[in-house]
């Protein structure tokens, strides 16, 4: 892989640290406080669609669901092999982080009943939104550096559209979607770390020979 395609050394750690801090902050503020739960529920109830509209929107959720995103991520990783096995592995690692993290956190993090009308399980982060983020992360690792800006903008918009769809259908709260974006940051950072791993040793070995 050309050196100019490698990220700045600090970028992966900035993404991982920022995403982790964002996740923690969202959980503490939106889930563990009365005002946070009230705000989250108010946004959800304001944007939630009526039954007729929800029935029309539901097929879109299936069309862009986690299974479809996993298949697309696998295709992106295979395409990444053309740029080296570390690039393909990095794309896969970033996607796996995005796909697995929401399932673990939803089980591990409790949601206290502070402002909810009835006891509810924790739904932060959204698995559907994180699945879209997984595809974006894989693409951000695989595509050339010159194309990453466009992928980042379009990918962020795609995550936002999926998030709005989930809120409109009443499946997730706003904080769940924001948390998925943070998971995406962590996944991207992880993918970049894996992609860049061993590059220093390769350069040193080439120089020595």
Description of each model-found segment:
Residues 116-209:
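Membrane-embedded catalytic cores of phosphoryl/pyrophosphoryl-handling enzymes
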Residues 1-12, 170, 198-203:
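Cytoplasmic juxtamembrane interface segments
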Residues 2-119, 140-141:
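Hydrophobic alpha-helical bundle signature of multipass membrane enzymes
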